[in-house]
Structure formats: structure tokens, C-alpha cells
Amino acid sequence: MDHLSYSQFSTYTKCPRSWYLGKLRQAEEKQTWYIPIGSAVHDMIEAYLLGRPLEPAGGISAEQFFYPLIEKQMLIEPDLTKWLAGGPETAPVTHEKALQRAVDCFEKAVEELEAIDVWEVEYDASGRLPGLSVPIKAFIDIIGEHKTKGPVIWDWKTGSTKPDNFQLQT
């Protein structure tokens, strides 16, 4: 292993067996709807911050970011009914609802960004920690200053799970 990411460390601390199977044995993960939602939103925000215009001006559209991720996952598991979904069991977030969730999360992020002077996008904070034999690979989504709250370090999250402070403490 040439490096360790925060998410790998987090997986290991929660479930060492899951980390072992996924990272060392390269076991195939079950496909999900929430991974392409989060990835599409993250990529759309990055494109927005790098100056791409929003739709309908021929710019950022959720479909352009979301559907290629779905197609890639379908190469692994083409049966969408086997994919894990978020939301309530009676109304799971799949298909069009998943795309709409990506749109909603992106629009909320753009709204929140209006109050932030962005200094860095995808800042490379990789390095070494004492006692760890492999380097830590770390990219910070946003570094900037909120107009009323001061300096911010932001990690985009599209789900209900909020990041813990270990990311910033390292």
C-alpha cells in the first residue's frame, strides 16, 4: 500500500474486516445510488468553483455528471434492483429521485457558497503522520472565509452522516 486516505482510515477504525476485504483483497463492493449522487455533486461543485457556468446557459447540468457514473456502475452490476438505496424503504432514493437529490444538494451548495470567499479548491494536504509507515493522502474540498463566520475548511457531504473532527485534527 503506497498511501492511506482519511476514508480508508475511517473504514478501518469502524470495521477492520471491511477495510481488509475492500482494500487488500479488492473484493467487489455492492453498488449503491448514494455514491454517484455524492460524486456527481462533488464534481459539479468543483466545476462551478472553477468557473463553469450553470444550466441553462450550456454549462453544468446534473445529468452530465450523474449518468456517466451510473453507467460505470452498471458495468459491475446491471440489475438496478440489487443496488443499495438511501431514504425510507417505502420511497427509496433511486433513479429520478437520486438525480433530483444530486440537483437539490448542488443547488444548496451554490446557495451556501455565496457567503464564502473561496481561497483553495481541492487543496492537497497530503503528508506523513508520526507512527504511520505510509503517507496520508488528503484533499480538502474548500478552504476559504465565510463572510460572517470567518475561515472555513469544508468537506462536502450529501448524506445525513456528518464528518467527524478527526479529518481536521490530522
Which residues does each PLM region occupy?
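Short, surface-exposed helix-loop/turn micro-motifs enriched in polar/charged residues
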Residues: 29-33, 58, 113-117, 134, ...
